[in-house]
Amino acid sequence: MADTKVDTSKEVSAKDLKEKKQVEEAENGKDAPANGNAENEENGDQENEVDEEDDDVAEEDEEDDGEGDDDDEDEEAEGGTGKRAAEDDDDDEDDVDPKKQKTDV
């Protein structure tokens, strides 16, 4: 396999593709689409951005859950009551629900 040549002349970098897209948009008049398809593509891009934001929020929630668990263990080690630890768990759940509601709106 070491003797096999790879033709890299056909490979296009992401930067080149982005520049090509910008040139095409300038030539075609991105702001004034001839048909509704161009507008739908723009909306599709916006939906993808929202999806990426939702993924980020989910990752943050996972990190927060890990930190909250450590706090509960510290209280138990200090001699805190089981009732207090249960109240803390309820607080963590309350913190998560508003975040989910914000992303749904």
Swiss-Prot record:
Composition-biased stretches, type Acidic residues, lie in: 39-78, 87-96
Question: Ranges of Basic and acidic residues compositional bias?
Answer: 1-30
Tissue-specific expression: At the 20-somite stage (18 hpf), expressed on the dorsal side of the embryo in the developing central and peripheral nervous system (CNS and PNS), in the tail bud and the pronephric ducts. In the PNS, expressed in the otic vesicle, trigeminal ganglion and the anterior lateral line placode. Localized throughout the hindbrain, with highest expression in rhombomeres 3 and 4. In the head, expressed in the olfactory placode and in the diencephalic region.
Task: Give the start-end ranges of region Disordered.
Answer: 1-105
| Protein location | Nucleus
Q: Name one GO biological process term.
A: negative regulation of apoptotic process
State the name under which the record lists this protein.
Prothymosin alpha-A
Q: What organism, scientifically named, is this protein from?
A: Danio rerio
The gene that this protein is the product of is ptmaa
